[in-house]
A protein has these predicted regions:
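Walker B catalytic acidic pair
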Residues: 94-95
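Catalytic P-loop NTPase motifs of RecA-like helicase/translocase cores
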Residues: 1, 76-79, 98-102, 129-130
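Conserved Walker A/P-loop ATP-binding site and its immediately adjacent core
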Residues: 5, 18-41, 129-134
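Conserved P-loop NTPase motor "coupling/switch" region that bridges the ATPase
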Residues: 19, 48, 90, 107-190
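Walker A/P-loop NTP-binding motif
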Residues: 3-18, 40, 109-111, 141-142
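Conserved helix-turn-beta segment of the N-terminal RecA-like "Helicase ATP-binding" lobe
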Residues: 30-54, 142-145
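Conserved helix/coil segment N-terminal to the catalytic DExD/H
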Residues: 55-88
């Protein structure tokens, strides 16, 4: 579902000449099994390559004519400078929970790669997997003006402090998270 939907939407934007290049950031385990296979199945007319291996090879692939470049989370850090110069119009992050913490090096690197003209699509089945505050890092990337500048401000919007070290979600926390993650598309099983 998610992968095919993204491929069709990106292909449509390419057909309309709105975007030219897409960087897909995903776990190593699904680079081939999900992304490369689905791109071959749903967009076989597009040039696709996987940026994996030695840094020089990754840089060459990022600088190539590939319309879709697939790279794993850790690979982004290795070749972030090449990515910044790679003229990507759309960055797709699959399993976006890997970017829930804005204090991590991974999050900071992705944040620096985002330019005003860069589109960012973050895919996740669980934007607030453990707690409503887990959505902060994702929301800060997707909609930076939709959340407080600092984590503590968001935490105070979605959580109540019970004791010095215990916080519980506020009754309207899910609505606050939903608003913070806009614009978003949400599919349910119903």
């Amino acid at each position: 579902g998610k992968t095919a939907s993204v491929i069709w939407a990106a292909d449509y934007l390419m057909t309309q000449k709105i975007i030219k290049r897409v960087l897909v950031i995903c776990p190593l385990s699904i680079m081939d099994s999900a992304w490369r296979n689905d791109l071959f199945r749903f967009a076989m007319h597009r040039r696709v390559d996987v940026a994996y291996g030695k840094p020089e090879k990754r840089r060459d692939i990022i600088g190539s004519e590939a319309e879709f470049v697939i790279i794993n989370f850790d690979g982004v850090e290795i070749v972030s400078e090449a990515i910044a110069n790679g003229k990507f119009d759309l960055i797709v992050v699959d399993e976006a929970n890997a970017y829930k913490n804005p204090q991590t090096k991974r999050w900071k690197i992705l944040s620096k790669l985002l330019q005003p003209h860069t589109w960012l699509w973050m895919l996740t089945g669980t934007p607030a997997s453990q707690s409503p505050v887990d959505a902060y890092g994702i929301a800060k990337l997707v909609n930076p003006d939709g959340v407080p500048r600092f984590y503590g401000g968001f935490r105070d919007q979605v959580m109540n402090k019970v004791t010095q070290f215990k916080w519980v979600p506020k009754p309207d926390a899910n609505n606050t998270v939903h608003k913070a993650l806009q614009p978003a598309i949400r599919f349910t099983k119903e």
